[in-house]
Amino acid sequence: MAAQASEDLKKLDLNGQAGDSKAAAATAGQAEAGEAEDDSDDDEVDGNAAPEGAASGAAKKKKKRKPKKKKKGGAKVQSSPPRVPISQLFPNNQYPEGEIVEYKNENSYRTTNEEKRYLDRMNNDFLQEYRQGAEVHRQVRQYAQKNIKPGQTLTEIAEGIEDAVRALTGHQGLEEGDNLKGGMGFPCGLSINHCAAHYTPNAGNKMVLQQGDVMKVDFGAHLNGRIVDSAFTMAFDPVYDPLLEAVKDATNTGIREAGIDVRMSDIGAAIQETMESYEVEINGQMHPVKCIRNLNGHNIDQHVIHGGKSVPIVKGGDQTKMEEGEVFAIETFGSTGKGYVREDMETSHYALVPNATPVPLRLSSAKNLLNVINKNFGTLPFCRRYLDRLGQDKYLLGLNNLVSSGIVQDYPPLCDIKGSYTAQFEHTIVLRPTVKEVISRGDDY
């Protein structure tokens, strides 16, 4: 999920990593072999018994039957569309690691330092929650990448992704407090063309994905408030490939440069240098790919998508350093337009302001809605469709009152100039004591 510049901050081939079908077959084969072995042992016992009518008249040995081992069921695999909870695919609650990147230069000692390795082991529960969320994200997005096609409505696409995330986390979010335990980390963003971020359809939206569209798909999955924030861009015309490649390369540059004690400004400078080395030809005209300078990456806190630190995507400015144990969303945005976004179109994204100053509310609708938000979302972002899903109606007046009172922050869509095209790629990284883990990395990007 995009973070605006510091001044704005103030206000799915699913690989079934649960278990390969071949491994399941092998396990089943071993179980059958074990049973055959049991019978074979029984025959040997019987064969050693004295022959019938032996002069010794020895009593016949009774054949002892060993209890048959139960055959193990085959390993579960993910359904299509994804509906099998990730916890059922990984019953031991050990989830796949992300991409492991060793620290470099003065931090290279961390990889083998015993104290740091001990601290790393202490973070296992925290990491498993992140890895579980990341596996949810990978399986959902890989399904989405294969199945999103021009002609579908944005509502159909968004709800398909969100339903899958809820199913795979095992939290439908309909019971009070359930969404705080797991589910959507924030609404599924589907920003088209010149719109770079924070667009998701409201109820009644009829917008249809077109063949010539460039769509940013930005969604989060969380377990216990550990939000995995990752985004990719889809285009159906290869003319936009250089734009997508520029932004993907820039994001990977940011990930490579990020680390403990690294200054934000240095990361931004490296991202900008990579991004702006690309250009794209559209309708016979060459366009330099520009960084959208007032959109940033950000750190992530528990249940809070924008933690307060920003990771710029241009040079200059913030000298703040990244610190051990922090979690960051490294995201970059490229544009063929001005490289600057403004608020535009109908608002859909909202979030409770953490530690907001209490304000007396006169509207009963605002009081009731605030109670619903606190119990169902807390500080997690939500959208109007989520309120509709909970059975809320006629809430707009109360919602606007919460916004004007500074209790809820609205996040309008952020757009460059009309006629331009924008792209986004994003990953969540964890700065572990020993290594940097790109939690959301997959085979796709």
Curated annotation (Swiss-Prot):
Q: What note does UniProt attach to the cofactor annotation?
A: Binds 2 divalent metal cations per subunit. Has a high-affinity and a low affinity metal-binding site. The true nature of the physiological cofactor is under debate. The enzyme is active with cobalt, zinc, manganese or divalent iron ions. Most likely, methionine aminopeptidases function as mononuclear Fe(2+)-metalloproteases under physiological conditions, and the catalytically relevant metal-binding site has been assigned to the histidine-containing high-affinity site.
UniProt name for this protein: Methionine aminopeptidase 2-2
Annotated region (Disordered) at 1-92
- InterPro entries documented for this protein: Creatinase/aminopeptidase-like, Met_Aminopeptidase_Type2, Pept_M24, Pept_M24_MAP, Pept_M24A_MAP2, Pept_M24A_MAP2_BS, WH-like_DNA-bd_sf, WH_DNA-bd_sf
UniProt xrefs under Pfam families? Peptidase_M24 (PF00557)
Listed NCBIfam families: met_pdase_II
Q: Organism, per UniProt?
A: Aspergillus terreus (strain NIH 2624 / FGSC A1156)
What is known about what this protein does? Cotranslationally removes the N-terminal methionine from nascent proteins. The N-terminal methionine is often cleaved when the second residue in the primary sequence is small and uncharged (Met-Ala-, Cys, Gly, Pro, Ser, Thr, or Val).
Q: EC annotation? A: 3.4.11.18
The cofactor required is: Co(2+); Zn(2+); Mn(2+); Fe(2+)
Question: Compositional bias of type Low complexity: which residue ranges?
Answer: 18-33, 47-58
Q: Which family does it belong to?
A: Belongs to the peptidase M24A family. Methionine aminopeptidase eukaryotic type 2 subfamily.
* Superkingdom assignment: Eukaryota
Q: Where primarily located?
A: cytoplasm
Q: Where is the composition biased (Basic residues)?
A: 59-74
**CDD domains annotated for this entry?**
MetAP2 (cd01088)
Q: Where does a divalent metal cation 2 bind?
A: D229, H298, E331, E426
Q: Keywords assigned by UniProt? A: Aminopeptidase, Cytoplasm, Hydrolase, Metal-binding, Protease
Ranges of biased composition (kind: Acidic residues):
34-46
User: What is one GO biological process annotated to this record?
Assistant: proteolysis
* Molecular function terms from GO: initiator methionyl aminopeptidase activity; metal ion binding; metalloaminopeptidase activity
